Every structure is written in structure tokens, then in C-alpha cells.
UniProtKB/Swiss-Prot annotation:
Signal peptide: none annotated. The lineage of its organism: Bacteria, Pseudomonadati, Pseudomonadota, Gammaproteobacteria, Oceanospirillales. CDD domains: OAT_like. Its EC number is 2.6.1.76. PANTHER family: DIAMINOBUTYRATE--2-OXOGLUTARATE AMINOTRANSFERASE (PTHR43552), DIAMINOBUTYRATE--2-OXOGLUTARATE TRANSAMINASE (PTHR43552:SF2). This is Diaminobutyrate--2-oxoglutarate transaminase. Belongs to the class-III pyridoxal-phosphate-dependent aminotransferase family.
Length: 423
């Protein structure tokens, strides 16, 4: 296995190649194959970008057929047959059945593009600059999105340029069990001397991913929506990692029965790992002037093709979402048992999440790193998240077979016991 050119030429900023130091050559479903002959079960799935697995045959065929037909690949924001099909499918398969009426902005290929566009739109729509965000939230690393991201590691990488225009509030559960964090927010909103500039919008992940798999409670989300309505603030749901079925519903906010003013999607939106993002907005918020927010790669037709194919194949009825919810219960049960095992061994641990977005909080980053490193040696790829990397994070493909799901969980259990000297 030759890695010299990779180690010599790629920037020190790389991360995943340090955690999983091998050269991958092919992938299918929830399996990755490496150059040295080893294979791995994938509980990372491109950090939530491969909800439908690697190289899903239906999506691969749709893409191959489109390329073979000399279909438009790059067209800026010009109209194409692929874009038309994508928008029609989005409306008919996803939006209308959920009673949602949104216009679509295609801002560029990444999630942070979508967040930048969303917060800029909110500021223009309300004529106010402040965006309320939450502790442990992650919304991207470009300057506008970074201002709403809590992680100090990312915020310190600006070279001294201050991040501005956002105010942080405590997320649900941040202050401990039983503490009503929204009452604090409401108190500031009602106090002209509280120091909080009147917000244009609130941005929220219903389940925080990078922050440690922290699910906001359903009543908490419903109350947050009401606060936004009562105080003339827009509600932005960042569904970049939690969306596209990850929590067991296409949109993660469906569990709470709320209707955001603006939604951002990316990661698994293309269905195939292709770079793609969109912003959904209530029609009356579409106040952009032509070309006011643009980008060279805002019309990636290959992603239109695979995204439309994914929506038709997986979301035309509720069969897929029920299967995701079933698998989520399997992971939840196994993670709870692992948490109990660790706690009994004197190392308190806990499980949390929603759907197939689940975390095992082992208390400290060193322990989590030992377990995930051992899991990699045993044939499982799984990462960590949280303020100190203390949460082992399951983001396996939603399409994973029961055999691979149980196999991956068995490897994780084996790895935990090996770290504790019990194997």
C-alpha cells in the first residue's frame, strides 16, 4: 500500500485519512474495500452523505444513462430537463404529501453555501442582522455560517478575523436536565436592556450532529417555533445532516410537526455522494434580485438526476422510512446495552439520538478514540463527535442490510470489550 505521495502532497488539514489510514479502492452498499485486501463495514457513510449507501444500483444506472446520453452536466442556473425533473419530483414526492409549499434556491454545491444563503436571505427579509444560534451547533466554516457554529476549533481558524452577527443560546438540555433553556431566550427577547439585538432569524439543527448527536425534544422544538412566530423571527432548520431520512423522516422537523420558514439540505440530497445543496423558503421570502446570490456550481445537473431518482425510489411511500425507524431501534437497543456495560465497569456512558442518527457518549474523547481505533482494526469505520470528541457516532447507510448492521454493531461491541480488557 503506497501512501507516500498522499502524505507528502496533501495538506496537514486532512482528518479522516489519519483516523482510517488505508487506501480505499471500491465500495458498495455499506462495505468499503481497501487496496491491501481488507474490507470494512461503513458506519460513517461520508459523514451522512451516503444515506442510500455506496453506488446504489438504481442511482448509478440513472447517472450512467444520463451521462451516456450527453446530458447537460454544467449549466450555471440555466434551465435543463434534469432540473425540471428534479423540481417536479421534489414537489410531487416530497413537498406536497407533507403539506409544504416552498420555493427552491440552488446556491452552490455545499451545505455551508446553503447556510450562507439562508442567513443572508433572512437578514434581507427582516432588515435585521442578528441570527440566534445554539450551543454545540455546527452550520459550516465559511464566515457567515461559521459565526453560527459553536466549535472553538473552527472559529479559531479564521486568522484573527472576528466572527460576527450571531448570538448563542443554550440548546435543549445544555444546562442540565430540568432547566428550561427557552425561558432564558424569551427573557432576553422581552428585555430591552438584556443585550440581545432583535434577531432576524433562529437557526437550529433538530438533532445536532457535529455537536454530539443531541436531539432537541419535540415540545422544545414546538415551543421554539411559537417563540419565532410571536417575535417576528424566521425559523431556519439546518437539515444538512439530519435530513434526507436520517432521523426516520425525510425532514427531521417532521417529528415535531413544525413548519420552518427556511430549510437547508445538502449531504445526502444528491443521493449518490455528489456535491449538491438547496435552500427551501416560503414563497413570500423569495426577495432575491436576479444574480444577487450566485455561484459557478449552482446547477449541477448530475446531482439533479440522482436526487430525483433517489426521491422516486425511496420516498414514493412510507416503506423506506418505516424501515429506517426499525433499524434505528436496533442501534438504540445495542447502544443502550453498551452504555450499561461501560457504566457497570466504572466508566459512565449513555445513548441518544433519533432514527439512524445515534450516539454513544463515553464521557471523554480519549476513550472514544481508543474504541473507534480498535473498531477500525476489527473492520468497522465509525467516527466521533461532540465538544471533546466523546460521542461515538453511528451514521450508517439507511439502506444497510440487517446482516451488515448487526455485524457492525457486533464489531463495535467487541472493540469496546477489548478496550476494557474483556474480550
Amino acid at each position: 500500500m503506497q501512501t507516500q505521495i498522499l502524505e507528502r502532497m496533501e495538506s496537514e488539514v486532512r482528518t479522516y485519512s489519519r483516523s482510517f489510514p488505508t487506501v480505499f479502492t471500491e465500495a458498495k452498499g455499506a462495505r468499503l474495500h481497501a487496496e491491501d485486501g481488507n474490507q470494512y463495514i461503513d458506519f460513517l457513510a461520508g459523514a451522512g452523505t451516503l444515506n442510500y449507501g455506496h453506488n446504489h444500483p438504481k442511482l448509478k444506472q440513472a447517472l450512467a444513462d444520463y451521462i451516456a446520453s450527453d446530458g447537460i452536466v454544467h449549466g450555471l442556473d440555466m434551465w435543463s430537463a434534469a432540473k425540471r425533473d428534479y423540481l417536479e419530483t421534489l414537489e410531487e414526492v416530497i413537498l406536497k404529501p407533507r403539506g409544504l409549499d416552498y420555493k427552491v434556491h440552488l446556491p452552490g454545491p455545499t451545505g455551508t453555501n446553503a447556510v450562507e444563503a439562508a442567513i443572508r436571505l433572512a437578514r434581507n427579509a427582516k432588515g435585521r442582522h442578528n441570527i440566534v444560534t445554539f450551543t454545540n451547533g455546527f452550520h459550516g466554516v465559511t464566515m457567515g455560517a461559521l459565526a453560527t457554529t459553536g466549535n472553538r476549533k473552527f472559529r479559531e481558524a479564521t486568522g484573527g478575523i472576528p466572527t460576527q452577527g450571531a448570538s448563542f443560546m443554550p440548546f435543549d438540555g445544555y444546562m442540565g436536565e430540568g432547566v428550561d433553556t427557552l425561558s432564558y431566550f424569551e427573557k432576553l427577547l422581552g428585555d430591552n436592556s438584556g443585550g440581545l439585538d432583535v434577531p432576524a432569524a433562529v437557526i437550529i439543527e433538530t438533532v445536532q450532529g457535529e455537536g454530539g448527536i443531541n436531539p432537541a425534544g419535540i415540545p422544545w422544538l414546538q415551543r421554539l417555533e411559537k417563540i419565532c412566530r410571536d417575535h417576528d423571527m424566521l425559523l431556519i432548520v439546518d437539515d444538512i445532516q439530519a435530513g434526507c431520512g436520517r432521523t426516520g423522516k425525510f425532514f427531521s422537523f417532521e417529528h415535531a410537526g413544525i413548519t420552518p420558514d427556511i430549510v437547508t439540505n445538502s449531504k445526502s440530497l444528491s443521493g449518490f455522494g455528489l456535491p449538491f445543496a438547496h435552500v427551501l423558503m416560503r414563497p413570500e421570502l423569495d426577495i432575491w434580485k436576479p444574480g444577487q446570490y450566485n455561484g459557478t456550481f449552482r446547477g449541477f445537473n448530475l446531482a439533479f438526476v440522482t436526487a430525483a431518482a433517489a426521491m422516486r425510489h425511496f420516498w414514493s411511500d412510507d416503506t423506506f422510512e418505516r424501515d429506517v425507524q426499525r433499524k434505528g431501534r436496533v442501534v438504540e437497543d445495542r447502544f443502550q446495552k453498551l452504555a450499561s456495560f461501560m457504566t457497570e465497569k466504572g466508566h459512565p456512558a449513555s445513548e441518544r439520538g433519533r432514527g439512524l442518527m445515534r450516539g454513544l457518549d463515553v464521557g471523554d474523547g480519549d476513550m472514544a478514540d481508543k474504541i473507534t481505533a480498535q473498531a477500525f482494526k476489527n473492520g468497522l469505520i465509525i467516527e466521533t463527535s461532540g465538544h471533546s470528541g466523546q460521542v461515538i457516532k453511528c451514521l450508517c447507510p439507511l439502506t444497510i442490510t440487517d446482516e451488515d448492521l448487526v455485524g457492525g454493531l457486533d464489531i463495535l461491541e467487541q472493540s469496546v470489550k477489548e478496550v476494557f480488557g474483556q474480550a
